C-alpha cells in the first residue's frame, strides 16, 4: 500500500543553477544547428558558383536533343582545365548584341559547339562543313534552310548553333561566341525522369 507523502519526501523545487544549466544547453544546441546550416549554405554556394549548377530549358532551340522544360546539370569546372570540344552542349552568357531585341543579356543561352578556333566553317545546301569536310550531325531536327559563306573562327572564340537550326538564335545570327562567356557544359538531364541521362 502506498504511503502518503510527507513534506520531506517531496521533490525539491528547481534551483537557479539547474535552470541556468538547461538554458545554456539549449543555446549551445541552437548555435550548433546554426553552424551546420551556415556551413551547408556556404558549401551549396561554392558548389553552384564553381562546380555545377542546375538549369532549366525555356525554349525550343535545341529540339530534339533538349525539350522545353528539361532540367539539366551544368559542369562549370571542366573548362578550367581544357577548352570546349566540338559537339559540346554549352551554357553561356550571350555576347554584346544589344541591337537584337529578342536577346536578353541577363538570360543564359544553350547551344552546341560547332566550330573551334582556327577552323574553317561554312554552311552550304543544308550541310555544315568544317575544314571542307561535311559534319555528321544525326541530332538535327530538320535540314538547314540557310547558307553561310566560308569563314575562319578567330582565336579565343567558338561558333555555336542550336540543334533546331532554323529556329535558333545563335552564331549564324549574331556571330562568334567568346570563350570567356561560357558558363559550363550541360552534361546530365535530371528531369523529366523518363528522359534521365547524359547529354550528347
Stretch-by-stretch model annotation:
Residues 1-108, 179-200:
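Protein maturation boundaries and topogenic segments
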Residues 57, 108-110, 123, 153, ...:
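A broad, structural micro-motif
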Residues 108-134:
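Mid-length scaffold segments of soluble, non-membrane domains
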Residues 141-156:
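Acidic loop->beta-strand submotif enriched in PP2C/PPM serine/threonine phosphatases
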Residues 162:
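Phosphate/adenylate-binding glycine loop and adjacent helical scaffold
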Residues 166-173:
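Active-site loop architecture of trypsin-fold serine endopeptidases
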Amino acid at each position: 500500500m502506498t504511503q502518503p507523502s510527507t513534506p520531506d519526501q517531496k521533490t525539491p523545487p528547481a534551483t537557479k543553477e539547474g535552470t541556468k544549466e538547461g538554458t545554456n544547453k539549449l543555446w549551445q544546441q541552437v548555435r550548433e544547428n546554426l553552424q551546420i546550416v551556415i556551413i551547408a549554405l556556404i558549401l551549396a554556394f561554392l558548389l553552384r558558383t564553381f562546380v555545377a549548377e542546375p538549369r532549366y530549358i525555356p525554349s525550343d532551340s535545341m529540339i530534339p536533343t533538349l525539350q522545353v522544360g528539361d532540367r539539366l546539370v551544368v559542369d562549370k569546372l571542366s573548362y578550367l582545365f581544357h577548352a570546349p570540344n566540338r559537339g559540346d552542349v554549352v551554357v553561356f552568357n550571350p555576347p554584346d548584341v544589344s541591337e537584337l531585341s529578342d536577346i536578353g543579356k541577363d538570360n543564359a543561352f544553350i547551344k552546341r559547339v560547332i566550330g573551334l578556333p582556327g577552323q574553317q566553317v561554312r554552311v552550304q545546301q543544308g550541310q555544315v562543313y568544317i575544314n571542307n569536310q561535311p559534319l555528321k550531325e544525326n541530332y538535327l531536327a530538320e535540314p538547314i534552310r540557310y547558307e553561310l559563306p566560308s569563314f575562319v573562327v578567330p582565336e579565343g572564340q567558338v561558333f555555336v548553333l542550336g540543334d533546331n537550326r532554323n529556329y535558333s538564335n545563335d552564331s549564324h545570327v549574331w556571330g562568334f561566341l567568346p570563350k570567356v562567356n561560357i558558363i559550363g557544359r550541360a552534361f546530365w538531364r535530371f528531369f523529366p525522369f523518363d528522359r534521365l541521362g547524359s547529354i550528347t
